């Protein structure tokens, strides 16, 4: 039997240790959907979606309003039955199950919501205990389990507090503890941080990441915020009008998004050429201004030196930045290249096209870049 020590993952809450059994590793998908379609009238909320989620994975599902995210989650926990397709949870097909047969499946799935959904007349401990009481757990076991969960989420000193006495982040921690009460295999997080301030959002994401790492808990993370995906997801699926527009490891999708909807949603996190340079762009000039997207091995080396050595043109950094996602460097740089020698410039652009994720000539400026 394996055990794991779990900490709350935030400096604003007391870090604690709880011993909880970690599930055994398995290669079989814990969630699998095949050609799932759900219609509302003549509108397909999800339209032939197929996906699989590995045990212990954090899968981010992102899209604009109306993309089908919430419908997809409701299909996973059996609240919506698809019109066609199959859904397997831990190897069991659930679309044909009646409510009685679905009940034990749902106990394997925890839910965290945007608006907390806590009972205002019950304390934090009582809110967490409620699903255990409904499930028939003896009182002594409930008390022990609730204490463990409060410790896990860093709220041991808030057990007797009512929701009105808690901050937004503390309410969400109670919601997470309640979702984990029955020891689910999968946690569905539906916009769980969208009502929180940025600092509290980071503390909740750190808690989810820590729980995932230490317990092996599988998390399906529904959000419209790319920054949430960037911080904790292993893989991302982009939904658009009920279809999967793009999917892949988070760092690869962020480094070089292929679909227009992904590119649009990533704009808020992507550096832009400053206005002082945009206003100078012309069709001809002494310096070519390029946008270069880098990731992986190309971003780890002395990239500018490599360009200069290969083409005899020395790039000049104008603007941009690098980030690290899933341990991989990812970034967008704006560079200037001397444009007098068209042959050398063409060779440099060719080198960039080969070694960078994406290269775009934005225009030219006169004078030094």
Curated annotation (Swiss-Prot):
Q: Which SUPFAM superfamilies does this UniProt record tie to the protein? A: ACT-like, P-loop containing nucleoside triphosphate hydrolases
Q: Which GO terms describe its molecular function?
A: ABC-type D-methionine transporter activity; ATP binding; ATP hydrolysis activity
Q: Which family does it belong to?
A: Belongs to the ABC transporter superfamily. Methionine importer (TC 3.A.1.24) family.
Q: What does this protein do?
A: Part of the ABC transporter complex MetNIQ involved in methionine import. Responsible for energy coupling to the transport system.
Q: What class of enzyme is it?
A: translocase
Q: List the disulfide bonds.
A: none
Protein name listed in UniProt = Methionine import ATP-binding protein MetN
Q: Per the record, what is one GO cellular component?
A: plasma membrane
Query: What is the protein's membrane topology class?
Result: Peripheral membrane protein
Q: Which UniProt keywords apply?
A: Amino-acid transport, ATP-binding, Cell inner membrane, Cell membrane, Membrane, Nucleotide-binding, Translocase, Transport
- Catalytic activity entry: L-methionine(out) + ATP + H2O = L-methionine(in) + ADP + phosphate + H(+); D-methionine(out) + ATP + H2O = D-methionine(in) + ADP + phosphate + H(+)
Annotated EC: 7.4.2.11
Spell out the subunit comment: The complex is composed of two ATP-binding proteins (MetN), two transmembrane proteins (MetI) and a solute-binding protein (MetQ).
Binding residues annotated for ATP, in chain numbering:
63-70
